[in-house]
């Protein structure tokens, strides 16, 4: 049953009536800590004898979290509710979440203690301003928490309880006046969900990863601006302890969701990808609890504000250095407590415009990036662990679409993985969480893990390359094969390397095959992350006679790097590397070096600066 009070409430009280605002209607937050007159807000008192500790408190539930409306002729209850919830807080949703609070205090050794408990409220107003004067005001009180007044007394002493029975509403904390002008051309409606479309800037931090879907954990402790997530404020008097406790029950909290493309990145699709990446417990599956306890010192009062918080996740579609689509998912977390000296109720009230809608992060900053397999792409399995030398024929039935091949190796070691004619290029990932989970007669145990960690590989379909990677027999791996023509017979070729070419792990080796002319040759490839490697294999044009040579120089552009030039040789144990030269500064390097015609070299680059999505490698051949 609604307990809303509908009565005209004009400017009869001692309210702020002169404002420095333009003509129009405004929604205003007047602050927390309001005690109401003429309402049954007194919850009762508690008496403790000398030396005893008393505890008083209350559990605010939906049935007791009743807002009080004071509409006017122009501003009815619906108008008040919609505008307040649009700007400041969804108090209808907040009332679904139970919240408890309590106070405790010990009586002195020579006196008894009387503690009297009251509800407190957050006050909102809708005002009409004309010529800097408030000509009409509607008021809404939304339940906050409570306040306890402690009085020490001697036996048979009369207690002055006038404090509790006030003739007008009053704020025991500092009043506020946070305002926003109401645009009457916009019809404000209460949102029944938190889905919003967002625009975003694609010029964000470059990710050193291939194209695909990524889920990013951006950390915990997010709160909405304008105190939209405020649970309530306790005024705790000196020598008193106060606490706020919230049991977070199933289905009483809802995520906040924004998307740039509701057709592709819907909330349901985003939640499925978050579950793929982090196996998170979504909002309707968990029951949690948090509690904050604070004690005021003997010489001053304090206030304790408690907020609901969120953990932020992002789902992005990353393509060629840009974010094509993005969704933001704010998962209800627990809470945050802010403690400060109690403000003076006599402090001046300052007119303050609302902050821009958004989020602030108060918790630890995170940027944990996990790739997820696009559900539109096929997954094939090599069910038996691959031996040291193995060839896998890619089924023709899947060659018209990109696909993943799930596998594990029989022996831990460094492997060269390539395709027939070194095309198309490959990308290899580790299946996150696949290590030491289970054993199935040494066969592949598919735990249906869709979370992947990028190791190395390239996006470009025209980039001849192969992979040198360290693989462990207790882990599962995915190789992504880009779309290839069904008329092309393609194979995955695995070989465990015993030579020191293993020094190149974990990197992609790009094959350069157009060095027949003199001049500058650019090779733009996706840049790995800082501290990781990318390699280039080149065979010097001409016949090998161990005498004739050509002059080259090697450099990077945009990205700083450290380089090592190797001569590649082959022996009975496999491929070996002979170090020819080391480069400590590759950015715009012009140092020449003489290389044997007909010989094969590998130039390995360690990225030390990520300035561009691509690394530009320049092999310059002198005439």
Swiss-Prot record:
HA-55 domain 2: annotated segments: 373-496
Gene3D superfamilies: 2.170.15.20, 2.60.120.1080, 2.60.120.1090
Gene Ontology terms: biological process: symbiont-mediated migration across host transepithelium
Compartments it resides in: Secreted
Positions of region (Sugar binding): 460-462, 513-514, 522-525
Top-level taxon in the UniProt lineage: Viruses
Span list, region HA-22-23 domain 1: 7-184
GO CC annotation: extracellular region
Keyword tags: Hemagglutinin, Secreted, Virulence
HA-55 domain 3: region residues: 497-623
Keyword Phosphoprotein set for record: no
Outcome when changing residue 604 to A: About 80% mucin binding
UniProt domain comment: The HA-22-23 chain and the N-terminus of the HA-55 chain are structurally similar, as are the domain 2 and domain 3 of HA-55.
Subunit structure: Botulinum toxins are produced as progenitor toxins of large molecular sizes of 12S (M toxin) and 16S (L toxin). M toxin consists of a non-toxic, non-hemagglutinin component (NTNHA) and the neurotoxin. L toxin consists of the M toxin and the 3 subcomponents of hemagglutinin (HA). HA is composed of subcomponents of 70, 33, and 17 kDa. The 70 kDa subcomponent undergoes proteolytic processing and is split into HA-53 (also called HA3b) and HA-22-23 (collectively called HA3a). Upon crystallization this cleaved component forms a three-lobed trimer of dimers with a hole in the center.
Function description: The hemagglutinin (HA) component of the progenitor toxin protects the structural integrity of botulinum neurotoxin; may increase internalization of the neurotoxin into the bloodstream of the host. The HA component is involved in binding to the upper small intestine through interactions with glycolipids and glycoproteins containing sialic acid moieties. Whole protein and the HA-53 chain (but not the HA-22-23 chain) bind to bovine mucin; if the mucin is pretreated with neuraminidase (removes the terminal sialic acid of glycoconjugates) mucin binding is decreased.
Additional information: This protein can also be encoded on a prophage.
The protein's name in its UniProt record: Hemagglutinin components HA-70 type C
Gene: HA-70
């Amino acid at each position: 049953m609604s307990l809303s009070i509908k009565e005209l409430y004009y400017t009869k009280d001692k309210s702020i009536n002169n404002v420095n605002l333009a003509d129009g209607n405004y929604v205003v937050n007047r602050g927390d800590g309001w005690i109401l007159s003429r309402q049954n807000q007194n919850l009762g008192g508690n008496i403790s004898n000398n030396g005893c500790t008393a505890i008083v408190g209350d559990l605010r539930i939906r049935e007791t979290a009743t807002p009080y409306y004071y509409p006017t002729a122009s501003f009815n209850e619906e108008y008040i509710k919609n505008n307040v919830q649009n700007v400041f807080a969804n108090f209808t949703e907040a009332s679904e979440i139970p919240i408890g609070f309590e106070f405790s205090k010990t009586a002195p050794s020579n006196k008894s203690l009387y503690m009297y408990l009251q509800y407190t409220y957050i006050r909102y107003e809708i005002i009409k301003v004309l010529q800097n004067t408030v000509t009409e005001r509607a008021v809404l009180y939304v339940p906050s928490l409570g306040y306890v007044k402690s009085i020490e007394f001697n036996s048979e002493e009369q207690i002055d309880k006038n404090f509790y029975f006030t003739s007008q509403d009053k704020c025991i904390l500092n009043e506020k006046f946070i305002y926003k002008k109401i645009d009457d051309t916009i019809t404000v409606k209460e949102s029944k969900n938190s889905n919003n479309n967002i625009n975003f800037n694609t010029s964000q931090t470059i990710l050193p990863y291939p194209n695909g879907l990524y889920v990013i954990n951006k950390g915990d402790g997010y709160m909405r601006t304008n105190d939209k997530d405020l649970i309530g404020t306790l005024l705790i008097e000196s020598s008193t302890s106060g606490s706020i406790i919230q049991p977070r029950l199933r289905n009483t909290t809802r995520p906040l969701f924004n998307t740039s493309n509701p057709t592709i990145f819907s909330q349901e699709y985003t939640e499925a990808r978050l579950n793929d990446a982090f196996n998170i417990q979504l909002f309707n599956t968990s029951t949690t609890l948090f509690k904050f306890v604070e004690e005021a010192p003997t010489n001053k009062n304090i206030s304790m504000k408690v907020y609901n918080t969120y953990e932020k996740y992002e789902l992005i579609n990353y393509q060629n250095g840009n974010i094509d689509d993005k969704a933001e998912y704010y998962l209800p977390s627990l809470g945050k407590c802010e403690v400060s000296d109690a403000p003076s109720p006599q402090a001046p009230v300052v007119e303050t415009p609302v902050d821009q809608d958004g989020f602030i992060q108060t918790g630890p900053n995170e940027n944990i990036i996990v790739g997820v397999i696009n559900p539109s792409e096929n997954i094939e399995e090599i069910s038996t662990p691959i031996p040291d030398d193995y060839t896998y024929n890619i089924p023709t039935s899947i060659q018209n679409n990109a696909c993943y091949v799930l596998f594990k190796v029989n022996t831990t070691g460094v492997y060269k993985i390539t395709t027939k004619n070194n095309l198309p290029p490959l990308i290899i990932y580790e299946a996150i969480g696949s290590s030491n989970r289970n054993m199935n007669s040494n066969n592949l145990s598919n735990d249906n893990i869709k979370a992947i960690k990028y190791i190395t590989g390239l996006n470009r379909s025209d980039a001849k390359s192969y992979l040198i990677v360290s693989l462990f027999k207790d882990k599962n791996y995915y190789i992504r094969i880009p779309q290839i023509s069904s008329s092309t017979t393609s194979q995955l070729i695995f070989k465990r390397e015993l030579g020191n070419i293993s020094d190149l792990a974990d990197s992609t080796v790009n094959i350069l095959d157009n060095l027949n002319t003199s001049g500058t040759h650019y090779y733009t490839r996706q840049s790995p992350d800082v501290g990781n490697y990318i390699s280039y294999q080149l065979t010097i044009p001409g016949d090998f006679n161990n005498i004739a040579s050509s002059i080259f120089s090697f450099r990077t552009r945009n990205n700083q790097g450290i380089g090592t030039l190797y001569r590649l040789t082959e022996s009975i144990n496999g491929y070996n590397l002979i170090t020819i030269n080391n480069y400590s500064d590759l950015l715009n390097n012009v140092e020449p070096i003489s290389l044997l015609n007909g010989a094969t070299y590998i130039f390995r680059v360690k990225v030390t600066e990520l300035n561009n999505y691509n690394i530009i490698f320049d092999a310059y051949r002198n005439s």
